[in-house]
Amino acid sequence: GIKNVAKITYWDMFRAFLTGRDPKYYLFFPMIEQGKKAANDFLKRIARTEDKDDKIKLSSFQRQLKAIGVWGSREKDDLSKIKIPVWVVNGDNDRMVPTPNSYDLAERLPNAHLTIYPDAGHGGVFQYHEVFVPEAIEFFK
């Protein structure tokens, strides 16, 4: 489950170091042809030479991974009281936030709408941005 996010993240960062790739290539996209192409396209879209964000500090990064792991080990919260529409979006091959978690979340939210993008990982919304953006605009109207 999500409590393994630190292990997966560190492994993919190591793979990225060995291959000279951005860690997002491995973290957000499945390593199938469509995923690899989507990863390359995404990384080109977000490449900036100006107004770049500061890099995350190592201590902040480690605290974030620890917090996710702790949260993933907790008992599930009762979500039945949440009545507003909630859109749960994921890829069908998400290793960081395993896809079954999305189905579980959508089942426990009484007014949930679930979208699972095929052949996509954690970066499914980046991979399917041309579909996701119009759907998001419609959902939030």
Q: Locations of the language-model features?
A:
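Soluble, non-transmembrane catalytic domains of enzymes that act on hydrophobic metabolites at membranes
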Residues: 62, 76, 93-95, 134-139
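Short beta-strand/loop motif that positions the catalytic acidic residue
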Residues: 82, 88-90, 94
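Conserved alpha/beta-hydrolase "acid-adjacent" motif
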Residues: 95-101
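Conserved alpha/beta-hydrolase catalytic His-Asp/Glu region
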Residues: 23-73, 78
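Catalytic active-site module of serine/aspartate enzymes centered on a nucleophile-bearing elbow/loop
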Residues: 111-141
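Active-site acidic short loop of glycosyltransferases
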Residues: 83-84, 111
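Flexible "cap/lid" loop of the alpha/beta hydrolase fold
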Residues: 1-19
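Active-site phosphate/pyrophosphate- and oxyanion-stabilizing loops and adjacent acidic/basic residues
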Residues: 103-104, 130
